């Protein structure tokens, strides 16, 4: 990749990964972001020049400009590049270009769990095949990075359905974790349009193998809609109708145990990640690795080393009002993700009271899923609800934090992190476990608990 490439919005997790990948594949790389952060510092340590002011960038020196979804079309650097006739590519479009440097690519998509599933597959393949690489939307704990380039053989990528940009990609293998109602503005608020986009993705000529979770209604709807016979389509899940069935799920000493029935063989596995949803995610990766020809024992040994991705069920021990308390930091921000996480906490800590501290993310999501929130938020023993993280949106009347808990009793409404800590200091003891959850800045609350 002998090109000069400027990455705009390089302080974000997705674009930073592409910048590193491009550099390791031989490109001359520079980046721009309006503010320096840990990711830009990492890029600078790798020898990538980072600009924080548009005035310092000579756009004419670059062959390609790659930009994140956070970069507006009116941004001066993007506008200048277009006026100069420089090729400008949205993040997913450049990922499609990057994929061409690899012999074989595996894409993970779905409304929930794609980052975790990508991290599981990346961790497995990096142990099973030293020439495997990955570019995912979170920090893979096994590698302490969101990117690894170990040659140009196999590439694991996270394919984003939220903006339909996965349609730019042409992988050989597709894993679909689930299909649910989120980011529906992308699909004109039409479930059928959403399904059609997934159908278009798996129908690409490059795709040879497709793995879908048959426990999920959306995946079942896709299976009913998709009727091409020229691809290897495998369903997996706890359902007796799955091609690869999961069974004997249980937890011993905080380790998840389960078995799968694969082509007539009963195979047992252990996993550090909690919850049935993570067993489903891991099973998709196991099947893909088995179908690639890797040995069961090698996969089994590699799986127990999988530790997931940052901010997905991260475990901490905090001292709160003199009590040692388990605190879990999690990125979940959709009713399905909330319900799955609370179920996983319940499975792992069956004798403890669950205190759920939740920060809703986006008023539009609150509004669009208003009927689904109360059931999910009722599953913990105690709910502490924070103000909604706006992510730049204007307040929508009837879609604020108290509105998504309509009909619930006994929950506590905190006006900020300090107020939430006040509640936790009154409620927490050795018999409680605290789940702090949301896609905004609520992770900062975890650090505040140690102060």
Curated annotation (Swiss-Prot):
Transmembrane segments: none annotated. One of its GO terms (cellular component) is cytoplasm. Its EC number is 6.3.2.8. ATP binds at residues 110-116. Pathway: Cell wall biogenesis; peptidoglycan biosynthesis. Keywords: ATP-binding, Cell cycle, Cell division, Cell shape, Cell wall biogenesis/degradation, Cytoplasm, Ligase, Nucleotide-binding, Peptidoglycan synthesis. It catalyses: UDP-N-acetyl-alpha-D-muramate + L-alanine + ATP = UDP-N-acetyl-alpha-D-muramoyl-L-alanine + ADP + phosphate + H(+). It is found in: Cytoplasm. GO terms for biological process: cell division; cell wall organization; peptidoglycan biosynthetic process; regulation of cell shape. GO terms for molecular function: ATP binding; UDP-N-acetylmuramate-L-alanine ligase activity. Gene3D superfamilies: Mur ligase, C-terminal domain, Mur-like, catalytic domain, NAD(P)-binding Rossmann-like Domain. Belongs to the MurCDEF family. Cell wall formation. This is UDP-N-acetylmuramate--L-alanine ligase. It comes from Francisella tularensis subsp. novicida (strain U112). The lineage of its organism: Bacteria, Pseudomonadati, Pseudomonadota, Gammaproteobacteria, Thiotrichales. The gene is murC.
């Amino acid at each position: 990749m002998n090109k000069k490439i400027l990455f705009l919005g390089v302080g974000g997790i997705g674009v930073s990964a592409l910048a590193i990948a491009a550099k390791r594949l031989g490109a001359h790389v520079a980046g721009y972001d309006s503010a320096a952060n840990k990711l830009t510092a990492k890029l600078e340590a790798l020898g990538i020049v980072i600009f924080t002011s548009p005035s310092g960038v000579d756009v004419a020196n670059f062959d390609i400009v790659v930009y994140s979804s956070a970069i507006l079309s009116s941004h001066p650097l993007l506008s200048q590049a277009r006026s100069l006739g420089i090729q400008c590519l949205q993040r997913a479009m450049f990922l499609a270009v990057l994929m061409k440097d690899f012999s074989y690519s595996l894409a993970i998509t779905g409304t929930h769990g794609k980052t975790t599933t990508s991290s599981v597959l990346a961790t497995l393949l990096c142990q099973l095949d030293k020439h495997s690489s990955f570019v995912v939307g979170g920090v893979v704990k096994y590698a302490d990075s969101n990117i690894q380039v170990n040659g140009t053989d196999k590439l694991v990528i996270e394919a984003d359905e939220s903006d339909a940009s996965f349609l730019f990609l042409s992988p050989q293998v597709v894993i679909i974790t689930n299909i649910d109602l989120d980011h529906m503005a992308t699909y004109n608020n039409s479930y059928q349009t959403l399904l059609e986009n997934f159908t278009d993705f798996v129908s690409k000529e490059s795709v040879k193998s497709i793995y879908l979770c048959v426990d999920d209604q959306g995946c079942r709807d896709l299976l009913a809609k998709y009727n091409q016979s020229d691809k290897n389509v495998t369903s997996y899940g706890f359902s007796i109708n799955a091609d690869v069935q999961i069974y004997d799920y249980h937890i011993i000493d905080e380790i998840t145990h389960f078995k799968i029935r694969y082509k007539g063989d009963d195979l047992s596995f252990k996993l550090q990640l909690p919850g049935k949803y993570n067993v489903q995610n891991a099973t998709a990766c196991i099947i893909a690795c088995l179908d690639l020809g890797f040995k069961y024992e090698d996969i089994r040994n590699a799986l127990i080393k999988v530790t997931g991705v940052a901010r997905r069920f991260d475990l901490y021990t905090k001292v709160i009002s003199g009590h040692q308390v388990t605190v879990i930091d999690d990125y979940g921000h959709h009713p399905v993700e909330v319900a799955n996480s609370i179920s996983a906490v319940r499975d792992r800590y069956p004798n403890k009271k669950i205190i759920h501290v939740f920060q809703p993310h986006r008023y539009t999501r609150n509004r669009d899923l208003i009927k689904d929130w109360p059931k999910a938020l009722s599953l913990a023993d105690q709910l502490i609800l924070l103000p909604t993280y706006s992510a730049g949106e204007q307040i929508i009347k009837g879609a604020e934090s108290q509105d998504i808990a309509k009909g619930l009793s006994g929950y506590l409404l905190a006006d900020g992190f300090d107020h939430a800590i006040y509640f936790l200091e009154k409620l927490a003891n050795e018999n409680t476990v605290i789940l702090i959850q949301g896609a905004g800045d609520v992770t900062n609350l975890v650090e505040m608990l140690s102060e």
